[in-house]
Each structure stands twice: as structure tokens, then as C-alpha cells.
């Protein structure tokens, strides 16, 4: 144990190991944050949600930070409502139980592109008589554009670019250009815009609330996909999923392999022969093809795939490598001494044989994590990912299916790819440093 402690202290001598450990701790911190911020059930609900969950977001919107690298500033997405006080609302009582509701919101538009869409969600309260609303759009040069006049139900959505009354008044002009262009120059008019909602209620206790959604060309820190989903959900939750899959597969595989190799070496005979024959058969089995068949015909669950991955990875060439070392250790003097004082087979295997392999196990365990992380993403890209969990591989699969690279949605591919590279690089740097520390022959390389 003292040797292990001293070896771990040597990590400080390797800058690559320090960098790897730092990145791993950052990934772990992101994992903890994701699990706390977005609980498992909520993450699944969000990722499987449709228009009812993500309908207010723009489609195929790059991250907001894209504006820092572009000469043209694209409009940001935002949402305001009367419920949280971000939209101004006043109510004036009238005669015979009528009332007038004035709702407005002003914002400064200093962008070089048009929004994808603007929409208003109405939430009204009434018994029998529907409220009536008039929606107006006020431009920086003082023009007042009527969007629509209509009676609203208790829950109703108005999309500016799909409203028939508004479209008919444009005579074929694009709705967003009609709202944001200067009619004199036919270019975007920058300045302060205002959306006005004037509502009339016809019953005592009747009320109108509204939400205004401005769907810009960029959104959030990670952007959105074809279903308007915020990719940050999958990027955050993909971190604990990737680390859990990689670490569990690595630990389960290498530890089990070492134990089986130790048992076969110690008992020898038919037990050792059986283990070697199973290993040789497993070495010629099509590993990826079996995983694809399991995912296709049995289950897409990531935990089922994890179990099969561990089973297929146990009887590999590592068993023969461990066996060669255990054969030498088995003939050591301290093993003979343990036999002499009557130590049991289990005690010798788990307290004398296996501990001698730990210095070789640790670097291999750390270095093998990226391979299993990439395996999970590979299966997801092949369409065999977990159907409910948001993962990095699922993001790449969706991007590939929707032709992200051909359509210029590079962020959709790059974000999960960079996270996969960081994960692989962090464990690789730490693993190589540990290999040098625990293997003296590599220290001068």
C-alpha cells in the first residue's frame, strides 16, 4: 500500500497527469450538476417532449455565442410574460361588467437578421363570454401594424407568420420582413419595437394573461435541434451517462478478468483449460456485431448493452497476459510460505496473488475508459442507443440523420464531438502517466 501511495504522489511530477485529473474532476462536477439541476425523470421528460414542451424555441438555432465570431449579429431568443411581470399589464374596469386589459412589451432590436418566428400564448379566464383581443406591432419609426383581431379561448396560441388575417394584409410579403424592414430602404430597421395587446372582457372576474416568445436565429449556450430541443439538456446529461458507462464497463471488465485469470492460474487443471478455451473462442467472436444484434432483437437499454459489453470483454487477451504474470507470482517464496502456514486458496488468491497485479491494473483501467465511452456513442450513431436517455451519441446520430454538416449546422456535431475528445484525452493523459509511474521501464520514454 505504501508503494501505491508513493506512486500516486509521483503524479505531481507529470503535467499531463495533472491536466488529465483536472479535466476528469471537471467532468465529474458537470455530472453532479446535471443530476442535481435536471433530475433523471425530468431529463427524460424534456428530451422526449414535443411541441408542448419545446414549441416556444426556434428550430436549428446555433448557440448564442456564435454572434461573437460573426460580423452579422443574429437575433437572440427570449420569452416574456405577464405572469412574471416582464410584460406590462393594466386592467381598467368598465360598465356592465366589462373591462379593458392593456398588455405591452418593448425591446431594443439591434441585429442584422430576422427572427424565425414570434408567437403569443394567451391564457384567459372566463365563464361563458370569450374575451376579445387586438394585437398591434409598433415599429421604431412610429408605424402601427395590425396583426389580428380575434376572440380567444382559455388556452390559445397565435403565430405571427401563420396568422391568416395578417398574411392577407401583406399581399405575399414575408411576415418578418414586413414587421422589421424599413419600407423606404427595404432593409432591417433597428431600434425599439413594441408589441401591444388590447383586450376586452365581458364578465366580472374575467382576465387575460399572455406570453410573448421571440424565436431568434440563435439560442442558449448549446443551440437547438430539429425538434426545438435545447441541446444543453443532452450535453449535460450525456456527461454522467458517458462516465458511468465507461467507468462501470472498465472496472467490471478488468477486475473480473483479473480475478478469473488468478483463479484459473491457481487451480490449474481443467479449470485453467476451460478458461483458456472460452477465451480463445471469445477472441474470434464478432464483438460489435453481437452488440448490434442484442440492440436490434432484444433491448436498446444502455444498461443491457453495458452488461453484454462487460460479458464480451472479460474473456479477452488480457486473461492470457494476467495468467503469464500469475504463473510467475505463484512460484514466489511468499506464496510457498502462505501455503506452509495453512492459508486457504481464497486467501492466497485475493490477498497475495491479485494485489501484485494492482500496479498493472490501474493504468489499464484508466486508459480503457475512453474506449467504452466511444463504444456507447458508436452504438448510438448506429441507431442502437438508449431510446430514452439523452446522450452525446444520440445528438450526433440526430445531427447525421438531419444532414447537419450539409446544412451548415456544425455546432450540432462539434459540441458532443468536442466533449468526447475531452473525455478521451483526460483519461488517456492520466493513464499514460500512471503507466510510466507503475512501469519503471517506461519512465525514461
Question: Language model features by range: what are they?
Answer:
Residues 1-246, 253, 399-422, 429-430, ...:
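Gly/Trp-centered helix-boundary motif
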Residues 224-445:
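Alpha-helical transmembrane segments of integral membrane proteins
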